[in-house]
Structures are given as structure tokens and as C-alpha cells.
């Protein structure tokens, strides 16, 4: 995402923020006010005789962040044996997992298991059966913030004309959410000795006795293991505690281990880079998604341990994971038990004891007591196999070679031809040049202030490497999300890697906030400050300052503030903040979900131990040599820190202060983009139905001018051909294995609730079992819509 001031790179940020450094002022005329209404501002001045400097990147660093194949990124859950090249169990998991392949089998069975729902109908897969998401249209509406369906009903069947839910240009401002239908309201009673779950039917104030719909659109479970945290609001923590989604935030969470075959003892665990496990243990107990109210994981374990795995569903004998467990004579389910699968998958210390475990006054076996642990770890390992990294764009990106300034010198464009052919068969005509221009718009830097339009590269009739719209500021790296494990622990950009090496916490940063609730104002004087002084902590109000363009001319700007936020979570103006706080909400323990605000709360001292990146300022002398003028004595606690001596880049950031302003309210996780063609409806609200609507949303600068929006979210002024090019690029991110349900994306049969009839009975849709070779019939887009259509 945008930085306060540039890192060592990417120099796209330099062009965007125009605060990379200082150089002698030029005499060029400044841009017009109309051209730079949305320009960003500088809060730092150079020493006398110097001015803002924008220069070429350091040697070996491209002037943009190129899109890369996901094959270049290590799987954060399943490692690779460096000798054989085969998948290998991660070292920290070996203490718990005895057989990785057996655990993956267990995880796939758990994920697709309809009997896990209190009604024996809702599995994890029920909301994630198509490209990792939910493609149903009926009984999917949640009433949103106002509590009413705005002329529709809970059992309403969505149609194309309903979208977009919100669009100021169309006079639409609907707060309904396209969520996922779960279970009917009920209260848990018991599990019988034969695995029958008894519940008492209930009624919900909004949904009555119908299936309830979630208040957030279902995110994809494909590539989900690359996320540092999961769920749109980030509540599924990076570290798994074995019990619930909240990781180390829940100090009481613990599992049990067999200290002997006759004794058990509590065990507190913290398994890092395991947010998929944290996420997996949430829905099975959620009274809207899968469970009767009051059911516990030991009770769910008691039930499933008594039932035939996948006993209500057909499994293909050629299933890439479960085929070996299918009975030779056919029929439904697997020819094994969940108890046997657990004992094969996990170390004996996790299940081998006859001693009872007493929980809430009830006695359970060790296997029942640890069922949440098995569930989370096994599903995480299964989801770690659901990696879509073979799209035509992934294949093409792997062939690109760049020269020192970012021009492509070698490539294999023919790898994009299957996208063109596939769409042509549907009557949708694009070219490989459309895809490549969309890629350019996605990955190339935003042009500097005062430059009209988006000058293309030489390939498309312009000069140089071309310019873009900054998509990959948030959709960064091969993972196409700044919320990735790699970005938040090691860094994707070269500058972030350097910050990590310097001891900075990459989970947070200080950033210019757009605050488009404020009007554009005339230039105002901004007094010089000592180089290196930290203005951002002590001047958090809405102040008007001079914009420094590449020639140093001040033009009208919006008042800008600089606040701290959680990297990877952004408010892009989908809905008003008060309707859903996102990562600005709280966990069940009353603490902020946001790392930034959580660390501010839990540290007693005014300044925390977390070093938060803010940026740097480099100046050049009359000869163009980079220098760092000595700073005057400062009261700022961050003065004098140096990130990269080779580039003389002083840091103007430091420990997170308890008192500094934050911008986390209304922010949601940046999703990855692979298979996005098939993951509609879009955004956490599910309010857009096609990729064209998504691109139009960003072209408008969002739908709501929220105060917590990043400054980069602004009207883009895209032409129709540029919007279509971006859609073409996004379609090229579809992995055909996902589209055709080929291994590892094959699956058991699933009988999916899809609304109710006039008598109140479930309407169901059967998703047939598919084996490793996939299906001849590809999956469909949401409502079978053309991704290039505005409606």
C-alpha cells in the first residue's frame, strides 16, 4: 500500500508521493490545479538549497513491482524436501502430525463433511464449493446495517439487475449483504450413542425459521494459506491455539496431550503461520453458519467419531486424496472411521490415552476433547494443497525477462492464447494485447503529478515502461495481496525487506490517509521543519499543506493526515464505516482486532517496542550526490535512525505510540486475485456481480468518501478500453484446474441448500463428485454473467 515516503523502492511510491528526496528546483511550469486535485502531500522540507528529488532507482531494482508467478513463492504451510523436491511436513508441525498425507485426507473429509452441520446438511464446503467461494443466489441476502431487506426478502433470489447494490451514478445505496445461507436457528441438546444430534428449533428476529445468511460475503479458501490472518476482519489469528480463531489473544485456550496411556495434561500451543487453522475452527460452532447454538467441539467430535466419514455423500474412486479410502463396492462415504483417520494422522501423544478429560462438567475422551485441534490442523494441511498457481498469467510471467530499466526483453505471449480462445468460444472477443495492457495498468507506477492520463509503454504506442493505476500497491507480490505471510513477515518489496532487517514490524505502518470527506483547499504555507523531525505523530489533524510535484510547484491539495494502520487491511469505500468496522472491531475479549490498536492498548508505556515504518528522505547536492544534511537537535524519539547507509536514507519512524492516531475502522483484508473470474459476488459486501463493476468502482474512487480511506483510492479517469484491459488481465488469472475441478480441486459430492419452497422445505442443488481428472463441464461464473459487462 502507499507509504508515507518512499522506501528504497518501489519507485512507484516516489512518483505517487513525490517525497523521495531533494534536488535543485527546476524552472518547469507546474501542473494545473485541475490535473492534481487528488495529489498527495509532503510533510517534510529539504534543507535550504535543496528540493524534492525524483531519480532513477538503485542499480538492480526495477522501477515497479512486476507481477510474478505464484510458483516463485514458498508454501507457508507445506514445505519442500530440499533433496527430493517432494512436499514435506513443516518442522514445527512434526511434533503433532505423524503422517502429513493422512492428515490431508482427514482435512479433505472434514472440509466436505455435511454431517458436521447440526442439520447434517451444511459443511465447510457448502459456502466454498465453487473456486473456493459461494455461487448460490437464493436465500443469500443479509439485511445489513438497517436490519431490513429493503424491499426484498430473506428467501429472495438475486438476479443480475440487482447489482451493483451501491452505485452513486445509478442512485443506488443498498446496504444488503450477499452472504451465505447457513443453518436454521436452533439450540443444541445432545449427541446420542449412535451419533444423532438433537436440537430444539428456534426463530430469529430477522430470518424467522429460515436459513440465516451471514453478514459478510464468503472469501475464497483457495490460496488461503498465504494469508497472514484470515477472515475479512482478520479475526483468525496467524498463530493457532488449537481451540478457537483467536490465537494468543485467548490465554485460557489449551488442548490436551497424553502424558501416558492413563493420564492426560493440558497443553498450551502457539503454532505460527497457521491462520487457516484458526479460521477453520470458527464456522463449525457458529449458530448462523453450521451449528446449533451451544454446541461445542467435543460434542461435534463425539458425533463424527460415531458416523461413517462422508456417509451422506458419494466420493469418486479416482479422488486425488480420498480415492484410496472409497469402498470397492461403491456406495456413499469412506471405508474407514474418523477415529482411525485421526490415529494415523496425528502423533500418539495427541490421542493415545484412556484417561477422561472433564470439560464443563462433562467427561470426554482425549480424542473428543482435542477435536478442534485435529479439525484446524487437518483442514489447514488440506487447504495448503489448494494452490492455484498455474493460470495463463502465472505461466506467462515466468517467461518474462527485464532489462535494467524495466523493459521486457524476452517473453512467451503465446501462453496467453488459451484465455483468448476460451472467451471467444463464449462470444467475448479480446486479444493478448488487451491482457498485456491490463497487466501494464496493474503493475506499472502511477504517473507523477501533472501528467495527464496514463501514458502507455512503447509496446502500446507510448514511450518508456508505461504507467499504471497502482493496483499492486495493495495486491502486492506473486500472492496479489499485501496481507500475505511473506509481506508481513519478510517483505515483498526491497524496501520492506530492508525495514525488516532493521528491526521494523511489517504488520503496521504510517500512511497518508485520503479523508475524502474534506474539501479541496487552496495552498497553505507549511513552515520548514528540521530534516528528520517526525511530524506525523504530533500533527495528526486535518491540515492543508503545499503539494510538492516533481518540479516543486505547490498546487491545491486535500488536507491530509498521516495515521497508522494494519498493513493488508484497507477501507476502499465499499460501505460506510459504521455499518461494519472490519478490523476496527473487537474480539470476544474486548480487545481491538487491529494489531495497531491492540498493541497500543496492551502496552503500558507511552511508546511500544514495535518499530513502525514511516519512510525516509534523501537529498542531493548541486552535483547530484545524495547527502543527508545533519538534523538539528530534535525532541522526536525517532531522529537519527538510518535504514540503508548506501542510500543515505534516514528513517523518520519508530516505536508505535499509544497516543498516535490510527485508521483501521471500516478496513477489510485485501483478497488475492487468482480465479477472481469465478469468485463473485465481490467485496466483503458481495455488492458487485462482475469484474467490470469492480473496475468501475475503483475508477470512481470508491462509493463512499470515508475518512479512513488511503490516499491512493481516488478517481482514476480510466477509458473504456483501459477498464476492459484490466478485466482481461484479471480473467487471465484463472487456473484451469480450478475451472475444470481437476486435482487438487476435485471433491466429493455435495448437496447444497439453495433457498426454500413455498412450504418452507429446503430446495437443494447437488454438486456431483469429481475425480482427479476433473469435469468436462466447467464451473460457471456467478449468475453466468459476462465479466466484461457492467450489469
What are the roles of these predicted feature ranges?
Residues 23-791:
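Periplasmic c-type cytochrome electron-transfer domains
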Amino acid at each position: 500500500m502507499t507509504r508515507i515516503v518512499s522506501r528504497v523502492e518501489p519507485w512507484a511510491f516516489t512518483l505517487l508521493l513525490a517525497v523521495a528526496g531533494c534536488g535543485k528546483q527546476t524552472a518547469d511550469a507546474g501542473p494545473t490545479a485541475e490535473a492534481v486535485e487528488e495529489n498527495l502531500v509532503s510533510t517534510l522540507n529539504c534543507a535550504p538549497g535543496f528540493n524534492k528529488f525524483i531519480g532513477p532507482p538503485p542499480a538492480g531494482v526495477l522501477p515497479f513491482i512486476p507481477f510474478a508467478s505464484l510458483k516463485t513463492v514458498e508454501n507457508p504451510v507445506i514445505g519442500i524436501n530440499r533433496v527430493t523436491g517432494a512436499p514435506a511436513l513443516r518442522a514445527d508441525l512434526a511434533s503433532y502430525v505423524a503422517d502429513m498425507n493422512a492428515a490431508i485426507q482427514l482435512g479433505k473429509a472434514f472440509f466436505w463433511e455435511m454431517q458436521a452441520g447440526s442439520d447434517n446438511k451444511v459443511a465447510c464446503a457448502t459456502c466454498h464449493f465453487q473456486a473456493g467461494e459461494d455461487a448460490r443466489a437464493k436465500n443469500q441476502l443479509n439485511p445489513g446495517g438497517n436490519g431490513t431487506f429493503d424491499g426484498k426478502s430473506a428467501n429472495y433470489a438475486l438476479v443480475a439487475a440487482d447489482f451493483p447494490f451501491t452505485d452513486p451514478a445509478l442512485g443506488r445505496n443498498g446496504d444488503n449483504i450477499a452472504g451465505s445461507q447457513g443453518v436454521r436457528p436452533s439450540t443444541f441438546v445432545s449427541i446420542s450413542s449412535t451419533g444423532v444430534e438433537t436440537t430444539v428449533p428456534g426463530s430469529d428476529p430477522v430470518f424467522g425459521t429460515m436459513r440465516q445468511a451471514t453478514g459478510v460475503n464468503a472469501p475464497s479458501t483457495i490460496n488461503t494459506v498465504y494469508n497472514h490472518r484470515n477472515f475479512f476482519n482478520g479475526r483468525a489469528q496467524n498463530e493457532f491455539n488449537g481451540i478457537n480463531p483467536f490465537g494468543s489473544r485467548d490465554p485460557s485456550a489449551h488442548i490436551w496431550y497424553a502424558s501416558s496411556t492413563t493420564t492426560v495434561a493440558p497443553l498450551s500451543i502457539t503454532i505460527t503461520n497457521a491462520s487457516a487453522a484458526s479460521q477453520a475452527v470458527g464456522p463449525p460452532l457458529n449458530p448462523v453458519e453450521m451449528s446449533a447454538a451451544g454446541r461445542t467441539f467435543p460434542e461435534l467430535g463425539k458425533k463424527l467419531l460415531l458416523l461413517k466419514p462422508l456417509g451422506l455423500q458419494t466420493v469418486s474412486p479416482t479422488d486425488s486424496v480420498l480415492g484410496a479410502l472409497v469402498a470397492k463396492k461403491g456406495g456413499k462415504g469412506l471405508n474407514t472411521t474418523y477415529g482411525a483417520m485421526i490415529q494415523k494422522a496425528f502423533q500418539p501423544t495427541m490421542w493415545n490415552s484412556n484417561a477422561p478429560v472433564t470439560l464443563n462438567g462433562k467427561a470426554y475422551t482425549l480424542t473428543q476433547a482435542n477435536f478442534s485441534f485435529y479439525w484446524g490442523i487437518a483442514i489447514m494441511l488440506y487447504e495448503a494443497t489448494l494452490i492455484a498457481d498455474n493460470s495463463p498469467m502465472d505461466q506467462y510471467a515466468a517467461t518474462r525477462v527485464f532489462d535494467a530499466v524495466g523493459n521486457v526483453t524476452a517473453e512467451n505471449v503465446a501462453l496467453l492464447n488459451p484465455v483468448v480462445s476460451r472467451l471467444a468460444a463464449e462470444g467475448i472477443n479480446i486479444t493478448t494485447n488487451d491482457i498485456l495492457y491490463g497487466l501494464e495498468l496493474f503493475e506499472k507506477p502511477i504517473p507523477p503529478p501533472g501528467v495527464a492520463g496514463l501514458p502507455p509503454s512503447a509496446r502500446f504506442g507510448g514511450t518508456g515502461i508505461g504507467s499504471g493505476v497502482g493496483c499492486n500497491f495493495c495486491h502486492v507480490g506473486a500472492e496479489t495481496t499485501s496481507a500475505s505471510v511473506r509481506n508481513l513477515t519478510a517483505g515483498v518489496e526491497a524496501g520492506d525487506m530492508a525495514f525488516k532487517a532493521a528491526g521494523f514490524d511489517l504488520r503496521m505502518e504510517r500512511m497518508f490517509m485520503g479523508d475524502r470527506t474534506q474539501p479541496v483547499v487552496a495552498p497553505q504555507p507549511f513552515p520548514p521543519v528540521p530534516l528528520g523531525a517526525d511530524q506525523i505523530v504530533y500533527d495528526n489533524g486535518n491540515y492543508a499543506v503545499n503539494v510538492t510535484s516533481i518540479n516543486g510547484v505547490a498546487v491545491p491539495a486535500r488536507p491530509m493526515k498521516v495515521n497508522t494502520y494494519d498493513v493488508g487491511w484497507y477501507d476502499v469505500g465499499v460501505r460506510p464505516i459504521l455499518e461494519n468496522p472490519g478490523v476496527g472491531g473487537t474480539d470476544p475479549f474486548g480487545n481491538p482486532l487491529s494489531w495497531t490498536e491492540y498493541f497500543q492498548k496492551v502496552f503500558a508505556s507511552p511508546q511500544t517496542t514495535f518499530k513502525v515504518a514511516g519512510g525516509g528522505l534523501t537529498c542531493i547536492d548541486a552535483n547530484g550526490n545524495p547527502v543527508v544534511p545533519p538534523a538539528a537537535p530534535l525532541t522526536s524519539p525517532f531522529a537519527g535512525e538510518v535504514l540503508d547507509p548506501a542510500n543515505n536514507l534516514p528513517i523518520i519512524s519508530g516505536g508505535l505510540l499509544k497516543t498516535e492516531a490510527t485508521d483501521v475502522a471500516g478496513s477489510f483484508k485485501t483478497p488475492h486475485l487468482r480465479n477472481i473470474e469465478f469468485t463473485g459476488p465481490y467485496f466483503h459486501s458481495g455488492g458487485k456481480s462482475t469484474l467490470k463493476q469492480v473496475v468501475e468502482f475503483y475508477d470512481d474512487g470508491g462509493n463512499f468518501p470515508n475518512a479512513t480511506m488511503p490516499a491512493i483510492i481516488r478517481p482514476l479517469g480510466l477509458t473504456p478500453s483501459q477498464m476492459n484491459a484490466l478485466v482481461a488481465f484479471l480473467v487471465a488469472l484463472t487456473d484451469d484446474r480450478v475451472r475444470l475441478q481437476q486435482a487438487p480441486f476435485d471433491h466429493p459430492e455435495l448437496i447444497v441448500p439453495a433457498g426454500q419452497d413455498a412450504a418452507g422445505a429446503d430446495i437443494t442443488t447437488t454438486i456431483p463428485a469429481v475425480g482427479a481428472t476433473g469435469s468436462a463441464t466447467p464451473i460457471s461464473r456467478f449468475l453466468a454473467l459476462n465479466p466484461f459487462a457492467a450489469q
